[in-house]
Every structure is written in C-alpha cells, then in structure tokens.
Amino acid sequence: MPLNRYYMAQKQTIQFEIAYQEVDMNNRLRLYTLEEHLLNTAGKVADSLGFGTQALRPYNCAWIITRMMLEMDYMPTQGEHICIETWVEQNAHMLSTRNYRIYLHTAAEDRLIGRAKSVWAILDINKREIVNMFDHPMFAGAVDGEVLDITRSPRMLPVTEPDVESTHTVRYSDVDYNRHCNSCKYLQIMMDTCLPSFLSECSADSGKQAIRLDINYQKEVYLGDTVTVLCKQTENDIQYTVKTVTGQASCSAKITKL
C-alpha cells in the first residue's frame, strides 16, 4: 500500500548539468538528450516514492512511455544547469499522466524554460501486454496531482510523401532492459534522418527559438528489426513516421517552431 494517498502527486526536482557530449553544433542541448533527462527524472522519482520499475520488477513488469508533449522556450548550453520538477497528474484507464516543468538554474534564480506532459503504461515484460495498474496494491487510492496547462497533441497522420527516407536496423545500443528499442533512441534515429538545416535553425539564435515536440509510441520493435524512417518538412515543422517491415507505424513525431 502507498505510504499516503498523495505519494504519486508529490513534486520532486532533480538537477542536471549539461555535458559537452549532450549539445549540438550550435552548443544547444539536443532534444533527444532532454527527453532522456525527463525520463530519467521520472524513473528516479518513481523509484524513490516506491512505485517505480524497481517496485514493479518482482512482478515482471515495467513502466513504458506511450506519448509525450514538450514545449521549450529556450534550449540550454554546455555547462548550464537545469532543474526538472515532476509529479503525477492522474491515473485513469490503465494509463498514468506525468507532468514536468524545466527550469534554467542559476545562482540568482530558477527560470521556467519548458514544460512537458507524458503518458505511461505498465508492461508485462514476459507477455508483452499492457496490464491494469490498479491490479497492483501500490496504486490503490492514489490522489491526483496538479494539472499542467499544455495543449494536447494534434492527431498525426502518417508521412506518405517523405522528403527524406532511410532505413535503420535496431542494434545492441538501441535496446533497453524492457528488451525493445528504447524510447529516446526513436527520436535520435528520426532526427538523424531529417534535413539538418531545420534542426540547426531550431537551436540557433541564442536558443531563443521556441519549439514543441509531440511523439507517440505505437508498436514495439526489437533487436535485429529493420524500420523505415519517413521525414516530411514544411517551413514551420518537421514530421516523422517510423514503420515496421509490415508497414505498421511504430512511432510518430512532430517538431514544430512556435
């Protein structure tokens, strides 16, 4: 049973220093590395409060992310510090909604530079099926947390007429403990496929270009699987679809200039 009914709604903050290998050609934090920090924060906080993957492992279960919406007003540079605050907003319909606020941390202040919302489910690692979190007593009676005001993701249609197309075979370094391609690896694979000028523009101009990421995880792929990455660019956004060899969408994403 949870320590108290408010344990999932509790806010906790973790600080990160932006390392040299985490920035791009404009010295701005890469988007997929920011996603890694968000997911690592979620994992550490959930473990510390007793409902993370460590608590689920005896049941052969683990948390998996199904969707994320992220808005950034500023992308930090190497050596700068960010603080990521996170909490669970709601558990409903076998899904858990987790929110984040991202702050640029200095000696003078913590300035809000971004916000994100993610949706999670619990995966039975052996059966490869989503399970009802409320079957686990640790989630009984948990109270909802603060609602984060961020626009819902638009419906993303598959890319059918790509500007760029590539293939990728899932490698050892792509696969995580859940035995599938890691969620952050999808974004890296997609961003490596696109036209680099768009991403360079997003991180140029002193990082002042506000951007939004919408990403949906739809179907697992595993070690040795080959996927096709389709990329379509307009003036203000770039959209991706990752397809399996059978033509099913494995992941869809959109990066938009705000």
Where are these regions (language model features)?
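Aromatic side chains
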Residues: 20, 100-103, 172, 186, ...
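Small beta-barrel nucleic-acid-binding modules, principally OB-folds
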Residues: 60-75, 208-220
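Structured core of small recognition/catalytic domains
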Residues: 180-258
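Hot-dog-fold acyl-thioester-processing enzymes
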Residues: 3-65, 113-117, 121-209
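HotDog/MaoC-like acyl-thioester-processing domains
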Residues: 3, 9-14, 69-157, 221-226, ...
